[in-house]
């Protein structure tokens, strides 16, 4: 798989870009703040419908514009597929697939399968559980695009159930039988969609685990062994059954957990049970990595998660596109060599770097330079050969 064309309109610092790409390696070189990362961010957005840098779409639209457009043409086994995404300010985003409008932007998921390595990856080890949940959900969706609808359904039910809990919080409405009956309905919906999402995550973690272990051994052969596991809000007592990923069991366990925590949820006005409170646990030896891993160990573990994702996607179908955003500058020589070895085998690798010295020695790659130019509409990014 490779991206043949990338087009941008009013995306971040890019007022306009039309870039023809090829299989193999392409390096975008430019000073920090010149817009090179925005190119990879646009491709990652086309792959996942999300940014790796911000949680909302508004910052993706260039200042003064009311929408941004990201267009890609992806080639997979000789077949071309065009995706156009319109990111709008204050209204729903739109998408086209092979120039035809689609009802939901989610319909383009799976066209571009990519793996992104970025400085922000350190948050996979050191950050909040939400970072690790997003890693799992993005990867699960790339492999099975239908998971996106499950995530959307779960998030919608979670918002509505939380709003009801807030309206019932404290002692004011405890006797409102109608409201409590409505809460029972939301419990059932939350358990239904939550079980589907948890089952997908658990299946993914079980497949990732041996790949993470192998990748970490490659990156840090003298370190402790790395391992991962799924930690559920259902509690340690249920962990063995939970890790089997049986959907019926998970749905029943979620319903039981919601019932057991109902008084606490009503008191606090928030949902205390469900996959939105779960975590991907990362271990080095017998210690949880977060809070105990050194800087080098944390980087190795973060890279291992991305390398494991690459291997799973490659085993599914065809090589995913590798996006390497300024990561070589963050790595020591051993980790550079390990990542470069993976990149050697990928069909397409797109890399950003501040200076040429950040690129592995001996790499044969097309080089494009990113510059900033002052215009009447502000500073915009441009490419030159």
Curated annotation (Swiss-Prot):
Cited InterPro entries: DNA-binding_RecF, DNA-binding_RecF_CS, P-loop_NTPase, RecF/RecN/SMC_N, RecF_2
Annotated binding of ATP, by residue: 30-37
Presence of the UniProt keyword DNA repair in the record: yes
Keyword Transferase among UniProt keywords: no
Subcellular location, record wording: Cytoplasm
Protein family per UniProt: Belongs to the RecF family.
Entries under NCBIfam families matching the protein: recf
Function description: The RecF protein is involved in DNA metabolism; it is required for DNA replication and normal SOS inducibility. RecF binds preferentially to single-stranded, linear DNA. It also seems to bind ATP.
Protein name (record): DNA replication and repair protein RecF
Gene (UniProt): recF
